[in-house]
UniProtKB/Swiss-Prot annotation:
Domain LRRCT residues, every copy: 416-505
Prosegment residue ranges: 771-800
Annotated organism of origin: Listeria monocytogenes serovar 1/2a (strain ATCC BAA-679 / EGD-e)
Keyword Signal appears in the UniProt entry: yes
Signal peptide: 1-35
Loss of function: phenotype: Deletion of both inlA and inlB prevents bacterial uptake by human enterocyte-like cell line Caco-2. Deletion of inlA alone decreases host cell entry; the reduction varies from 98% to none depending on the cell line tested.
Protein name: Internalin A
Effect annotated for changing N558D: In strain: H4
PROSITE patterns (alphabetical): GRAM_POS_ANCHORING, LRR
Effect of substituting T142S: In strain: F5782 / Serotype 4b and H4
Domain LRRNT, chain residue ranges per copy: 36-76
Function of the protein: Mediates the entry of L.monocytogenes into host intestinal epithelial cells; transformation with inlA alone allows L.innocua (a non-invasive species) to be taken up by host cells. Binds to human receptor cadherin-1 (E-cadherin, CDH1); the chicken homolog of cadherin-1 but not cadherin-2 function as receptors.
Record's keyword annotation contains Magnesium: no
Amino acid sequence: MRKKRYVWLKSILVAILVFGSGVWINTSNGTNAQAATITQDTPINQIFTDTALAEKMKTVLGKTNVTDTVSQTDLDQVTTLQADRLGIKSIDGVEYLNNLTQINFSNNQLTDITPLKNLTKLVDILMNNNQIADITPLANLTNLTGLTLFNNQITDIDPLKNLTNLNRLELSSNTISDISALSGLTSLQQLSFGNQVTDLKPLANLTTLERLDISSNKVSDISVLAKLTNLESLIATNNQISDITPLGILTNLDELSLNGNQLKDIGTLASLTNLTDLDLANNQISNLAPLSGLTKLTELKLGANQISNISPLAGLTALTNLELNENQLEDISPISNLKNLTYLTLYFNNISDISPVSSLTKLQRLFFYNNKVSDVSSLANLTNINWLSAGHNQISDLTPLANLTRITQLGLNDQAWTNAPVNYKANVSIPNTVKNVTGALIAPATISDGGSYTEPDITWNLPSYTNEVSYTFSQPVTIGKGTTTFSGTVTQPLKAIFNVKFHVDGKETTKEVEAGNLLTEPAKPVKEGHTFVGWFDAQTGGTKWNFSTDKMPTNDINLYAQFSINSYTATFDNDGVTTSQTVDYQGLLQEPTAPTKEGYTFKGWYDAKTGGDKWDFATSKMPAKNITLYAQYSANSYTATFDVDGKSTTQAVDYQGLLKEPKAPTKAGYTFKGWYDEKTDGKKWDFATDKMPANDITLYAQFTKNPVAPPTTGGNTPPTTNNGGNTTPPSANIPGSDTSNTSTGNSASTTSTMNAYDPYNSKEASLPTTGDSDNALYLLLGLLAVGTAMALTKKARASK
């Protein structure tokens, strides 16, 4: 029995130890830094919870499965960790790799780097291209010499201020605006940062810097850089720099990039004679003279500026790469001496002569698309070319390119040129000049205006003049291993001489003019009573000829002198309200809408207020003077009907006239009240003041019944009679209409709203917080200890 009890006690103690050690591994992350160890073998995927990281650690630790267990000794063997581009989202578990000196978590999806905070043996960290914003966990890693964090979401770099052993720090493509934390990192030799920085003053003491990249910031003042005399490389692209004077002292520079700034004057660069790599693209530079002495240059980028003269480059014979694209170049002869060039860009310029490149036999890549080059015979000896881009030029003959057998990339599309003009005739024929690399003619793909092709000529039969004809070509070509489509459009202008006749009221003169030219304007003709308007392509109407811009068309034309007739004003007066029309002499007036006037009929427009002559808008013509026409009216007559109990008489009266009052009618037993505009009630007509309206009316005779005394019977009170003879019935009480006891006030509600206590919804009903959940472990351990003590006591008593 005692042995069984001992076995039971041992089992409990073992369970406590196993449970406790498991909890220690899972909770040690939140305790003291010294607890970042595991006390027993643990599966890899329990230490490194991120699936991708667990898979990587399985390989690093030499295991076959992520469920395999490892010890702290195993973890301590890991000193470097290359885990880039694995899609890792969490680095939990890395805190147990206490001997790490180098890590690479680049190109993952990290946001939290807390597990690194106590890995003080780290000397190099690469975590670019993640989503990291908080770098506080790096604050104590003072052994770091290299830190790469570009392309993250970092704003605050203050945690780096004590990392004084850093000699490489890469912080580009973040949201950093303040770099004051860097001022004490005087061991830095390589530095790049931010994209919102404006002030470079914190760099003043970093005199050991050799490579500095301040690209994509908002920097305009670079005066502090004059103190960094050890700089060998300065990259300052995409800023707001216009003055580079402070760079004149940095004579150790061998690489300088100022691409994408606001530079016009580059005179300071003349002193930087150690430069081998210079990028000045995307600025406003036109004068290259300061570069003439930079003879060590091997790479020079000058694209997208305002350069037309490249003669200062003629002596830079060490150049291997030269970019001159997107400028204003026509003459490229100075590059003929740059015989070490292997890479040359000339696209988007105005170059027609490419022959200066003929001596550049080391060229491997040549780009001159979007120029005006027609002759490529100078390229025949450039047999080292492997990339040729010559689209959008005027090339018609590919024969000179046949020997460029090393080409792998080729562009010859969209050529376009215009031939010299030929005289127009009904039948036009021109030779086809487009040849492929074998010298064979390439037949047209399309021909305008119904043209036809019989090798070697393209022919058009033109029934009427057209200013140009054209044809296109398109054929796949292969040169070396490069294949492209050689395509383009050829335009043939046509010119012709045509007659222009000038007509002045039947008289004409004739001149010959070449189509497309401006006409010489004749002297202005004169016509009595008219003003000369100009020359038009029709006797009336038409389009006026503009001698400054209109060019002779491709046919005979007639131009007519047109004159404007003097115009006059007709005023229409309607009782003082006027409108007007302007009409040419002898022109017809447009009849206005007939005006209206209450009670009147419009008679017409007259040349006098009263009387005068009526204007006939169909035949009367505008005289040679201004006129006024007056609206005249005649008053309308309306009928008044007098109705006496259905019998009527009438009167005809003009609008606003007074009616003659008829004799008062009589009616037995009644008294005549007057004439009203309604049979009953209505308004009584006042014959002294009321005027005839603009409509017929009816007036009704109204009477009042004479009063009659009724007999008195039975003591009843007779009904009263009103003035109109109507009996007024006695008032009647309406049943239920007594409102004397009705209250009109609002009754007070006997129900009140009470906020009763609700034990199920009360916020105070929940239990208070008792502390963190780790107390459960200690309660369990306590209970087990008490149980053990009780068992031991019982055992001791039993042994006595």
